[in-house]
């Protein structure tokens, strides 16, 4: 049910690729078994294997799926400027938005640590940035749905099930409500979110 896994599932749906999903139990250390480490030495989830080609890091997988299987380039346009904005949003999602989620919530969920107010401020700052990016925008990067929207909707929906108040950020909230309607695989994403919700 993690955000990175769900972003890959939605991207696959958007390009019409049927994934043969294998679920690993991280608590039981299945990702550390030699057969998985042989595929992905970094032993991170998600990992994609496509006809013997292994790739990990969800946003890299998203781009690969679109470039290899997309009928058009609309989800990741070839125009360098459009692509640059999408990349910026993907890196923002990875290094700022989703990272703020991991830094604040994971210690509470997995180590039973108390909430860290400083880490919470980083979440608020990340949402302020996203709110600014989305000023007057229907989509996260450009004028149509891209892999940036898919990655961000996976992250933002995770904040929602964790109880974060997205509605405080008007532009994010408006974008998110639209993204729920237009993102392929949203239903599966939300089902994964609800699985994840048990941790909160």
From Swiss-Prot:
<comment type="function">
    <text>Conjugation of reduced glutathione to a wide number of exogenous and endogenous hydrophobic electrophiles. Has DDT dehydrochlorinase activity.</text>
</comment>
<dbReference type="InterPro" id="IPR010987">
    <property type="entry name" value="Glutathione-S-Trfase_C-like"/>
</dbReference>
<dbReference type="GO" id="GO:0006749">
    <property type="term" value="P:glutathione metabolic process"/>
</dbReference>
<feature type="binding site">
    <location>
        <position position="2"/>
    </location>
    <ligand>
        <name>glutathione</name>
    </ligand>
</feature>
<feature type="domain" description="GST C-terminal">
    <location>
        <begin position="79"/>
        <end position="200"/>
    </location>
</feature>
<dbReference type="Pfam" id="PF02798">
    <property type="entry name" value="GST_N"/>
</dbReference>
<feature type="binding site">
    <location>
        <begin position="43"/>
        <end position="45"/>
    </location>
    <ligand>
        <name>glutathione</name>
    </ligand>
</feature>
<dbReference type="GO" id="GO:0018833">
    <property type="term" value="F:DDT-dehydrochlorinase activity"/>
</dbReference>
<keyword id="KW-0456">Lyase</keyword>
<comment type="subunit">
    <text>Homodimer.</text>
</comment>
<dbReference type="Pfam" id="PF00043">
    <property type="entry name" value="GST_C"/>
</dbReference>
<dbReference type="InterPro" id="IPR036249">
    <property type="entry name" value="Thioredoxin-like_sf"/>
</dbReference>
<protein>
    <recommendedName>
        <fullName>Glutathione S-transferase 1-1</fullName>
        <ecNumber>2.5.1.18</ecNumber>
        <ecNumber>4.5.1.1</ecNumber>
    </recommendedName>
</protein>
<dbReference type="GO" id="GO:0004364">
    <property type="term" value="F:glutathione transferase activity"/>
</dbReference>
<dbReference type="InterPro" id="IPR036282">
    <property type="entry name" value="Glutathione-S-Trfase_C_sf"/>
</dbReference>
<feature type="domain" description="GST N-terminal">
    <location>
        <begin position="1"/>
        <end position="73"/>
    </location>
</feature>
<keyword id="KW-0808">Transferase</keyword>
<dbReference type="InterPro" id="IPR004046">
    <property type="entry name" value="GST_C"/>
</dbReference>
<feature type="binding site">
    <location>
        <begin position="57"/>
        <end position="59"/>
    </location>
    <ligand>
        <name>glutathione</name>
    </ligand>
</feature>
<dbReference type="InterPro" id="IPR040079">
    <property type="entry name" value="Glutathione_S-Trfase"/>
</dbReference>
<comment type="similarity">
    <text>Belongs to the GST superfamily. Theta family.</text>
</comment>
<dbReference type="InterPro" id="IPR004045">
    <property type="entry name" value="Glutathione_S-Trfase_N"/>
</dbReference>
């Amino acid at each position: 049910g993690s955000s990175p896994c769900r972003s890959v599932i939605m991207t696959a749906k958007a390009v019409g690729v049927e994934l043969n999903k294998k679920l690993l139990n991280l608590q039981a250390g299945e990702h550390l078994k030699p057969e998985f480490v042989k595929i992905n030495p970094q032993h991170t989830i998600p990992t994609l294997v496509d006809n013997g080609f292994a790739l990990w890091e969800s946003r890299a997988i998203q781009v690969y799926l679109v470039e290899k299987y997309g009928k058009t380039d609309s989800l990741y346009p070839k125009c360098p400027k459009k692509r640059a904005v999408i990349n910026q949003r993907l890196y923002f999602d990875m290094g700022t938005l989703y990272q703020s989620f991991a830094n604040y919530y994971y210690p509470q969920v997995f180590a039973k640590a108390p909430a860290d107010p400083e880490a919470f401020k980083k979440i608020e700052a990340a949402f302020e940035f996203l709110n600014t990016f989305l000023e007057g925008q229907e989509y996260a990067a450009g004028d149509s749905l891209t892999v940036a929207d898919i990655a961000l909707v996976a992250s933002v929906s995770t904040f929602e099930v964790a109880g974060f108040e997205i509605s405080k950020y008007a532009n994010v909230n408006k974008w998110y409500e639209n993204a729920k309607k237009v993102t392929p695989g949203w239903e599966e994403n939300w089902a994964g979110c609800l699985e994840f919700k048990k941790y909160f």
